Amino acid sequence: MSFKQYRSIDLILFVIMYGVCEYLAIKAATVWFDEPYCISIMLPMLAIVMMRWDRYSIIHAVVYALLFVYFQSGSLTQYFIYLIGNLGFMLLLLYVKKVTKEKIRATFFGSMSYLLIGFLLMEVFRGLASMLLAGKDAGVIFTFIMTDMLSLVFAILVIIIVRRIDGLFIDQKQYLLELNSQEERIDGGWQDE
């Protein structure tokens, strides 16, 4: 399998996982329990995909926003608000480039800073989009942050867990090169001369 094929399969699997989990979370909150709150898996999934695939996570930012609003039966304005919010999250790539994925992964503080900055970017851009497209006042940014606080707590827990799973919260190109290097060392030790 080529690297491009691996990346494509991985990206597709993350879209499917997101779609299923988000659909179930939204239906649980709106249909099964009729509560106004729901925990979204969007933030941790975007953070994981960005860590794995850098700029390719923009595909997920767009698809996740579209699926989220679709599952909520949202309006056209909401589509734009969530698209803009998720594209705001993509500014996190600048942080990743400056700090490096290795430093982000290396410590709890690095991973949580990465997640929190992404969360704030997403919420601020959603708020700004709401101000521009729906005529909301600046308080809408605070509203977005507060309504998504449960999702942030959930995202923190997810990132704590995935940091401990080998190969999940890491740049995939680097990870595959490391695996290949380990394989060559192991195989090299067993070759007959």
Q: What are these model-derived regions, one by one?
A:
Residues 19, 23, 90, 119, ...:
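Alpha-helical transmembrane segments
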Residues 19-22, 65-66, 86:
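Residue-level recognition of pore/gate-forming positions within transmembrane alpha-helices
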Residues 1-51:
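Hydrophobic transmembrane alpha-helices
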Residues 28-36, 75-85, 95-193:
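Membrane-embedded alpha-helical hairpins and interfacial helices in multi-pass inner-membrane proteins
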Residues 48-62, 101-102:
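Membrane-helix interface "capping/anchor" motifs
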Residues 60-82:
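Membrane-helix boundary elements
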Residues 44-48, 68, 85-95:
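Alpha-helical transmembrane segments and their membrane-interface exit regions
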